[in-house]
């Protein structure tokens, strides 16, 4: 109700300014004790972790983990922060975020703007949140792709003791050549190296933190087969399906529809759900799947579950539907 009143004002602002203002308003409401949405318990076990409910916040909304406590008040079963990189970086030039309200869509080319992994850890330590926290890791834009593994290792080692699970993001279209890590020897080397280090860290801390891969929706059936085989070979703990798409289907003739970047929101639902279905058929339940992409209703969250997801995540849907979407999704899922 409150969001439906605030939305016209927020949509009158530049998208990035509205994003900042929304988080600021959430923080203030949380501090005043006004931010507590009651969501039914629906315990879901995934990757050896019991989630209070299967609906999470996707990475990208809180890149630096600076708003965890306020976001927790919306009733999410888990929160994923990031994408974080070893060193701070400003991301791509503005404007880099575009609403397409006619299609309930967003195009972004943010470029992993963040304050760096050390600042994120400071924020996590300052948070009172004791729920399930995913940390999404990436590489710096100026790190050559052939040295990308080094950046992921730095982040993995630093966040390991602060995360419930760690997501390896190799699917953003907004960092040059990043998606090349989804194929061939590059993926093999990345997964092999990170898995070996994960096991060493588990021994060091006497605590196992699951490792999750996040992939793009713009994959062929052959890509799905290859990635699935790699996930099984290296015993990766989970897969997030999917990130944003490079396709412009559904927005090509709309204002901002041809801006470069990743498309999210309603137009990516079918594409990401089909990708999810393909991975589910290939992996046959051996690795749990987290469905994300275009969820704007409880029915769509349930559809992700029917396509093979154990958990779902939302982000763009929150912008168009508001925080009640969390409750709708939890109620619709089994």
UniProtKB/Swiss-Prot annotation:
Give TM regions: none
* E.C. number: 1.3.5.2
Which Pfam families does the UniProt entry name for this protein? Answer: DHO_dh (PF01180)
Annotated FMN binding lies at 59-63, 83, 136, 169, 214, 242, 265, 294, 315-316
Q: Which family does it belong to?
A: Belongs to the dihydroorotate dehydrogenase family. Type 2 subfamily.
Q: What does this protein do?
A: Catalyzes the conversion of dihydroorotate to orotate with quinone as electron acceptor.
Q: Which gene encodes it?
A: pyrD
Complexes and interactors: Monomer.
The residues listed in the UniProt record as binding substrate, with positions renumbered to this chain, are 63, 108-112, 169, 174, 243-244
Which GO cellular component term is one of those annotated? cytoplasm
State the species of origin.
Answer: Acinetobacter baumannii (strain AB307-0294)
Coiled-coil intervals, chain numbering: none
Q: Which GO terms describe its biological process?
A: 'de novo' pyrimidine nucleobase biosynthetic process; 'de novo' UMP biosynthetic process
The UniProt entry, under PANTHER family, shows:
DIHYDROOROTATE DEHYDROGENASE (QUINONE), MITOCHONDRIAL, DIHYDROOROTATE DEHYDROGENASE (QUINONE), MITOCHONDRIAL-RELATED
Mode of membrane association: Peripheral membrane protein
Spell out the subcellular localization from the entry: Cell membrane
Catalytic EC class: oxidoreductase
Task: Extract one GO molecular function annotation from the record.
Answer: dihydroorotate dehydrogenase (quinone) activity
Which reaction equation describes what this protein catalyses?
(S)-dihydroorotate + a quinone = orotate + a quinol
Q: Which InterPro entries match?
A: Aldolase_TIM, DHO_dehydrogenase, Dihydroorotate_DH_1_2, Dihydroorotate_DH_2, Dihydroorotate_DH_cat, Dihydroorotate_DH_CS
Q: Which UniProt keywords apply?
A: Cell membrane, Flavoprotein, FMN, Membrane, Oxidoreductase, Pyrimidine biosynthesis
The active site annotation covers 172
Identify which cofactors the protein needs according to its UniProt entry. FMN
- Protein name, per record: Dihydroorotate dehydrogenase (quinone)
The cofactor note reads: Binds 1 FMN per subunit.
Pathway the protein contributes to: Pyrimidine metabolism; UMP biosynthesis via de novo pathway; orotate from (S)-dihydroorotate (quinone route): step 1/1
């Amino acid at each position: 109700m409150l969001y439906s009143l605030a939305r016209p004002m927020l949509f009158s602002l530049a998208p990035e300014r509205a994003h900042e203002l929304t988080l600021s308003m959430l923080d203030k409401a949380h501090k005043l004790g006004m931010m507590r949405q009651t969501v039914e318990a629906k315990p879901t076990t995934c990757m050896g972790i019991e989630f209070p409910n299967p609906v999470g916040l996707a990475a990208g909304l809180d890149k630096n983990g600076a708003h965890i406590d306020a976001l927790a008040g919306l009733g999410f079963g888990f929160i994923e922060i990031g994408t974080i990189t070893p060193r701070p970086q400003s991301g791509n030039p503005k404007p880099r975020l575009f609403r397409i309200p006619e299609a309930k869509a967003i195009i972004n080319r943010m470029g992993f703007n963040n304050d760096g992994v050390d600042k994120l850890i400071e924020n996590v330590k300052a948070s009172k949140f004791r729920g399930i926290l995913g940390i999404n890791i990436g590489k710096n834009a100026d790190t050559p792709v052939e040295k990308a593994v080094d950046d992921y290792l730095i982040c993995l080692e630093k966040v390991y003791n602060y995360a419930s699970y760690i997501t390896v993001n190799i699917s953003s279209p907004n960092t040059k050549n990043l998606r090349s890590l989804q194929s061939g020897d590059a993926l093999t080397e990345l997964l092999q190296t990170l898995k070996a280090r994960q096991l060493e860290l588990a021994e060091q801390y006497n605590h196992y933190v699951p490792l999750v891969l996040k992939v793009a929706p713009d994959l062929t059936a052959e890509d799905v087969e290859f990635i699935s085989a790699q996930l099984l070979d290296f015993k990766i703990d989970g897969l997030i399906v999917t990130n944003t798409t490079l396709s412009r289907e559904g927005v090509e003739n709309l204002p901002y529809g041809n801006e470069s970047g990743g498309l999210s929101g309603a137009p990516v639902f079918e594409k990401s759900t089909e990708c999810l279905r393909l991975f589910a058929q290939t992996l046959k339940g051996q690795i749990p799947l987290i469905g994300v992409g275009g969820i704007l209703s409880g029915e769509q969250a349930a559809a992700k579950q029917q396509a093979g997801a154990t958990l779902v995540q939302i982000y763009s849907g929150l912008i168009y539907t508001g925080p009640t979407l969390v409750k709708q999704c939890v109620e619709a899922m089994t």
